[in-house]
A protein has these predicted regions:
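Internal transmembrane alpha-helix with an interfacial aromatic "cap," most often the third helix
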Residues: 15-32, 37-71, 83-85, 120, ...
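Non-cytosolic membrane-interface motifs at loop->transmembrane helix junctions
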Residues: 28-40, 94-107, 156-168
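Alpha-helical transmembrane segments in multipass membrane proteins, preferentially the mid-helix core
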Residues: 52-58, 83-88, 107-133, 145-152, ...
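A loop-to-helix transmembrane entry motif
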Residues: 71-74, 95-113, 129-136, 163
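Membrane-helix boundary elements
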Residues: 76-103, 120-124
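Terminal transmembrane helical module of multi-pass membrane proteins
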Residues: 136-182
């Protein structure tokens, strides 16, 4: 499952980070509005799926049975986020996309993240799981870098560069899983 997460991360963020890097190194963000908007749209969906996969990793790792409410919450929030991402009011390809829709679509995403942070924190602690002891922190860091971008990137464009350490936090997430899997197979 961490392989799926790596592909989701790489493909989703490539659509967002590559145009941003090219824009900042060439003619500026204003000349890459469509590419940046499309990249944000794609990465919004892929990262939602990333969290659903991460939830299933938690269930598998800790042999979770039941927890129907948590499963329903994760899937409902993911579905709501994807529906909100598809709404034309997002104006993804426009230079003046409304901040309000950036906030609306990120509320279910943040709630998904919060649920998964709590689940991994509690489970790693209860199971004395040294391999996954920092999984919760990778998610906290990813949101700590992501939230300022959502709220301030239109006013302070360079803040969009926080997407790079956000991606590094996600890479750390995948590495934690890969190293644990490699260790358990050996």
């Amino acid at each position: 499952m961490f392989g799926i997460m790596a592909v989701l991360l790489g493909s989703g963020d490539a659509f967002h980070l590559v145009p941003r890097a090219v824009a900042l190194c060439t003619t500026g963000l204003e000349n890459f509005t469509v590419q940046l908007g499309l990249g944000k749209w794609i990465t919004s969906v892929t990262m939602t799926i990333f969290y659903v996969v991460l939830y299933h990793i938690w269930r598998e790792r800790y042999q979770i049975k039941g927890y129907k409410a948590a499963t329903a919450a994760i899937y409902s929030l993911a579905g709501l986020r994807i529906v909100l991402c598809m709404m034309p009011q997002n104006a993804w390809l426009s230079a003046d996309a409304p901040l309000s829709w950036g906030i609306y679509r990120n509320i279910p995403f943040a709630l998904m993240g919060l649920i998964i942070i709590v689940l991994f924190y509690k489970s790693a602690k209860e199971n004395n799981d040294s391999s996954f002891r920092w999984m919760w922190l990778t998610i906290v860091l990813s949101f700590a870098f992501y939230i300022p971008v959502v709220l301030l990137a239109d006013v302070i464009p360079m803040i969009g560069m926080l997407m790079i350490p956000k991606t590094c936090a996600y890479v750390w997430t995948v590495l934690i899983g890969y190293k644990a899997m490699k260790k358990e197979i050996a």
